[in-house]
């Protein structure tokens, strides 16, 4: 209400001799009189509030849609992010996820099925927001990706399997040995701070998209907050 009132006040000032005066420089009596006129107008024309709120919502949706579109273009071509296939694919899914997100884990089998059925690129953007342990596994996995891109997906599959997955040092060492990744190389990459910087950038990108939880998906330019009930929903979006 105050936002609408302020906009009307500014509009009235701009069609009056006071247009060139600063908003805060008008006299108290003049300001009070103008506000009284606005109050009376709004009270007798309540539809103006509805129209103003609808316009505000429409403008915010347009801004968000543009942000999603730009994010899709940028992330599809960002080789610092784990991805399956390239931006030449007809369809794409960008997933903002957390290794400790149960709903994200539910999506993994659906993604695997979609990759077999569609010309599809999948980009994984790790945003560790659920618990402190998520940050450790996210940064470590990013370091693995920087060292050995193929090996990363073995780590990804491990962490995205349903159930709790430890990310303590002993477990990570064991995984590196099992997946033929040199642990010392991963440690050296961690010391470079590049993995930390990538995860920090991902979190900043999620903030720009107003992401408040995982999973958050961008599918062929359209955003989707939350998981699918079943594969048919994902398939329908890719066939659209």
Where does each model-flagged region fall?
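Classical Sec-dependent N-terminal signal peptides that target proteins to the secretory pathway
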Residues: 1-21
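Alpha-helical scaffolding segments of alpha/beta enzyme cores, especially the outer helices
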Residues: 9, 109, 113, 233-236
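Cysteine-centric redox/oxidoreductase cores and disulfide-bonded domains
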Residues: 129-240
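Short amphipathic alpha-helical segments that mediate assembly, nucleic-acid/protein binding
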Residues: 6, 30-31, 183
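Extracytoplasmic thiol/disulfide redox context detector
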Residues: 19-132, 190-191, 195-213, 219, ...
